[in-house]
From Swiss-Prot:
Function: Catalyzes the attachment of alanine to tRNA(Ala) in a two-step reaction: alanine is first activated by ATP to form Ala-AMP and then transferred to the acceptor end of tRNA(Ala). Also edits incorrectly charged Ser-tRNA(Ala) and Gly-tRNA(Ala) via its editing domain.
Xref: CDD domains: AlaRS_core
One annotated GO molecular function: ATP binding
Gene, per the UniProt record: alaS
Organism encoding this protein: Methanococcus maripaludis (strain C7 / ATCC BAA-1331)
Superkingdom per UniProt: Archaea
Protein name: Alanine--tRNA ligase
Lineage: Archaea, Methanobacteriati, Methanobacteriota, Methanomada group, Methanococci
GO biological process: alanyl-tRNA aminoacylation
Enzyme class label: ligase
Binding site for Zn(2+): 596, 600, 700, 704
HAMAP family found in the cross-reference section: Ala_tRNA_synth_A (MF_00036_A)
Domain notes per entry: Consists of three domains; the N-terminal catalytic domain, the editing domain and the C-terminal C-Ala domain. The editing domain removes incorrectly charged amino acids, while the C-Ala domain, along with tRNA(Ala), serves as a bridge to cooperatively bring together the editing and aminoacylation centers thus stimulating deacylation of misacylated tRNAs.
Length: 892
């Protein structure tokens, strides 16, 4: 369809706005200033508010949040509390909350769910890492920013307002703040995102964009646009930029983090920068954009020329301050990330949090900040407590995770040198792909890689090229910022397509009923489709029910598009139209119910023990055991496992009712929060809520006990680290726990009987035996060393001279450790040692003056591997044949 949007609105006509075309960038814009020729945005116009605040009074960030929210509340908009910065809490297509509209996608924007309020106002913290390398350098970029927004969701039956009112509200707010209307321009633009599109205005004053007003009304299909039934007012006001413009500080960072910045400057011993230089630099910083120019030095040169300073001197002066700005921004970003429960890891949102954290730690090292990152983030939490008290409630977790991650970072850096040296040994250039691999696989920041390579170049025999792009972290973040659907390899046969109505699920209304009558709607392949069923289809981590239909075994139950497919052992016994009788295997169902309810109980217990940050990433509910995967930043200790198990069984014994209700999606989210999606994102406007009173609330479609006492004893069998940042708990319930405990008891009794001691003496005895074994092992190693020293003299006269090397090829009786001890005593200078034992073990070791690689040698005389100075493996030829091969190699 052809789109010809008229950007003229009622306000423009009433106040006499003129439509003009910018003489610099050719964009069309609206202005009250008859003499204006440019659009007002940078780089067409420089910042003109620095040193000259543009509002009636100076606003702090907190004051601006309140001012914005109160203004739109007065205009009939219902305030809505913020959502987490982790968008994965309610959607599965993006990781972080990148805009206020993301809070309402996809359910509200697709028209599937009504908005919680309409119209509404929200001040939503957002995180975007696609500009992370600009932060600190441009004066305006932030990783974490607050998008103030008023949204109206217009339908035919419920129309609120559109372009006229939206522009009017914007102009009125800016006037109320004291911004001169003649300085405000509305640039005509177009917005696209998430498959939707629409015209928009970019609202500019004094060289800075303060707001974007989007009118979402199209769906993009290929290269075409189609109108959507819901017309959405999607605005975004930069709360931080409003506060900045109201204060007129050189950069946005001073307006937000003045206390933190001063503390960091004092700690790092960074002197103040001349105000004239800083003001001029900050004004021109509006023209700086790393993603467009790609080279910080080119940008710095422009600033240096403008203020008449040597570029190196300017860089030396400003760079430390830019690092401090970045640290201030990043620590606020981390406060939101960890405060909203992200657990650092090597995947997804955990990867992004670790990226921001390690970049911050690197910058702190670079400028010599001695205070800990915990102290900096504590300051941030204190400053944000008035608006975001929930972040301070997570302080204990935030401090713990910072401790854990800082230790991991130090370990990474310590082992990093060896990793880089090994890579550099075989390369003439460390490429961008190499840098990304070193960062992704080993966690090594590119600056550290460059430091190691620069040192190698100073003392090495060759020069290794390396260039770290100014936008490295942006490149890496963009690769990880979008959620990619995981590839699931299914072992199940794909279900057939059938045209029948959705199956009525009887187990929701009758959870304890085992028999039912139903009509056969379709028979296809080995599946029977009924109009209603008591059989639970596999889903939500829970295994399917089994049983019989008309005496024929039901061996699998699956669901597709609301239709339940019953796989039976003999499909020939069914035809369409039959009235059949189904019977669910109750013993099997009961085990599944117990284990599924136990999953919710253990999740609740783990939250109490480990903290509110834990989030369920997966589960598996079978008849014999259950499995729960949760996020956590370190291994769960034995003491923590015992406490989780104790609390879980306390909940069981408390006989808590397990209630099942269907709720409106908005009502459920407002009442319980996004933790209802622990088991995964659930589609639709109605959710089935499982509530264990006072314990746990989740949106869940599984079968459950009616009371926690029905679960029986819960036994946590084991925990394991299935990936970085994710712990798996395996557990049993009821008689399954009795069986598992019996196995453990048998193991205990059998072990005690073998040692001939009472059960209660087993730990003490095993510990004593272990200590004795360690002592004996130490004695054996010392004896092996002495044997090696003695054998050294026996073998000293058996070396043969071949070229520049003295070579020993000898068959020796002993263990690999004993042969290693012998070789250690002999491999010095120009000596080359090849030892073999009676079990085909082969050892090659060289002295420090031998240039031949032992790794290459062992591949020629046997099979194995190792390093250049030492290799181990197996041999198949005799001593004479091996000696002959070595001579040939040395004579080449």
């Amino acid at each position: 369809m052809e789109i010809n949007h008229d950007y003229r609105v009622k306000l423009f006509d009433e106040l006499g706005f003129e439509r003009k075309q910018c003489t610099e960038c050719n964009q069309w814009f609206w202005t009250l200033d008859k003499d204006r020729t440019t659009c007002g945005d940078s780089p067409c116009d420089e910042y003109s508010f620095i040193g000259s605040p543009i509002t009636r009074k100076k606003y702090t960030y907190n004051e601006m949040v309140r001012e914005f929210t109160n203004f739109f509340a007065e205009k009939g908009h219902s305030p809505v509390k913020r959502s987490p910065v982790v968008a994965k809490r309610w959607r599965d297509d993006i990781l972080l909350t990148i805009a206020s509209i993301a809070v309402f996608q996809p359910w509200v924007t697709n028209g599937l769910v009504k908005p919680v309020k309409n119209p509404l106002v929200i001040a939503q913290p957002c995180i975007r890492l696609n500009d992370i390398d600009n932060v600190g350098r441009t004066g305006r970029h932030l990783t974490c920013f607050t998008m103030g927004a008023h949204h109206a969701f217009n339908s035919k039956d419920d129309y609120k307002y559109w372009t006229d009112k939206t522009v009017e509200y914007c102009f009125e707010l800016m006037n109320r703040l004291g911004i001169d209307g003649k300085t405000i321009t509305f640039i005509e633009s177009w917005w696209e995102g998430g498959g939707n599109a629409g015209p928009c205005y970019e609202v500019i004053t004094h060289g800075v964009e303060l707001a974007t007003l989007v009118f979402m009304q199209y769906k993009k299909v290929g290269s075409e646009y189609e109108e959507i039934p819901l017309k959405i007012v999607d605005t975004g006001y930069g709360i931080e930029r409003f506060a900045w413009a109201s204060q007129g500080t050189p950069t946005v960072y001073e307006s937000l983090f003045s206390e933190v910045i001063e503390k960091l400057k004092e700690d790092a011993g960074i002197p103040g920068v001349d105000e004239k230089i800083m003001a001029e630099s900050a004004t021109l910083a509006g023209l700086m954009d790393i993603e467009n120019v790609g080279d910080l030095r080119v940008l710095r040169q422009k600033v240096a020329e403008k203020i008449g300073m040597d570029v190196d001197e300017l860089d030396k002066l400003i760079s430390p301050l830019e690092y401090i700005y970045a640290i201030a921004d990043h620590t606020r970003c981390l406060s939101f990330m960890f405060g909203d429960g992200i657990v650092p890891s090597n995947v997804k949102e955990g990867y992004l949090a670790r990226l921001v954290l390690r970049k911050t730690l690197r910058y702190m090292e670079k400028i010599g900040i001695s205070m800990s990152i915990k102290d900096i983030i504590s300051m941030q939490l204190e400053n944000m407590k008035e608006i975001y008290p929930e972040l301070s409630e997570m302080k204990e977790y935030i401090m713990d995770v910072l401790d854990s991650e800082e230790k991991k970072y130090i370990q990474t850096v310590n082992r990093g040198r060896g990793i880089v040296e090994r890579m550099a040994a075989s390369k003439s250039e460390i490429t961008l792909d190499d840098l990304i691999e070193l960062y992704d696989s080993n966690g090594l920041p590119p600056e550290i890689v460059k430091d190691v390579v620069d040192e190698l170049n100073k003392k090495g025999k060759k020069t290794i090229a390396i260039t770290v792009p100014d936008n490295f972290y942006t490149i890496v973040a963009e690769r990880h910022e979008e959620e990619k659907p995981e590839e699931v390899v299914s072992t199940k046969k794909e279900l057939p397509e059938v045209e029948v109505s959705e199956t009525e699920l009887l187990f929701f209304k009758h959870p304890t009923q085992v028999e039912f009558e139903a009509k056969v709607l379709k028979t296809v392949e080995k599946y029977v489709v009924l109009d209603k069923t008591l059989f639970y289809a596999e889903g939500g981590g829970q295994k399917y029910d089994i049983g019989q239909i008309n005496g024929i075994e039901v061996i699998d139950v699956q669901k597709k598009n609301g239709i339940v497919f019953h796989k039976v052992s003999d499909i020939s016994k069914f035809k369409e139209g039959d009235i059949v009788k189904g019977t669910v295997n109750w013993e099997n169902r009961l085990k599944l119910m117990r284990n599924h309810t136990a999953t919710h109980v253990i999740n609740a217990a783990a939250t109490r023990v480990l903290g509110k940050h834990i989030w369920q990433t997966g589960s598996n509910v079978d008849t014999e055991k259950g499995r729960l995967d949760i996020t956590h930043y370190e291994r769960i200790s034995r003491e923590q496992v015992k406490e989780i198990e104790r609390i879980a069984n306390e909940i069981v014994l408390s006989k808590m009712p397990v209630n099942s209700t269907f709720m409106d999606r908005n009502d459920a989210e407002q009442k319980y929060g996004f933790t209802i999606y622990q088991g995964g994102v659930v589609p639709g406007d109605t959710l089935r809520i499982i509530e264990i009173e006072g314990t746990d609330v989740e949106a869940c479609g599984g079968t459950h006990c009616s009371n926690t006492s029905e679960i029986g004893y819960i036994k946590v069998l084991k925990t394991e680290r299935i990936q970085d940042g994710v712990e798996r708990l395996e557990y049993s319930t009821g008689m399954g726990s009795v069986s598992e405990i019996a196995v453990l008891e048998d193991t205990l009794i059998d072990s005690a009987e073998i040692l001939g001691i009472p059960n209660d003496q087993l730990p003490k005895t095993v510990k004593r035996f272990f200590e004795e074994w360690k002592e004996q092992k130490k004695t054996i190693e010392e004896l092996q060393k002495k044997v090696g020293e003695l054998v050294k003299y026996e073998l000293a006269d058996k070396f043969e001279k071949y070229g520049n090397y003295e070579v020993l090829v000898e068959q020796v009786s002993g263990t690999p450790n004993e042969l290693m001890s012998i070789a250690d005593n002999l491999a010095v200078g120009n000596k080359l040692i090849v030892l073999m034992n009676e079990n085909d073990y082969l050892l090659c070791k060289r002295g420090e003056n031998v240039e031949l690689s032992m790794k290459e040698l062992i591949r020629n005389i046997g099979k194995g591997g190792g390093k250049d100075n030492l290799a181990q493996g197996k041999y198949s030829e005799n001593k004479e044949q091996i000696t002959e091969k070595i001579i040939q190699i040395l004579n080449k």
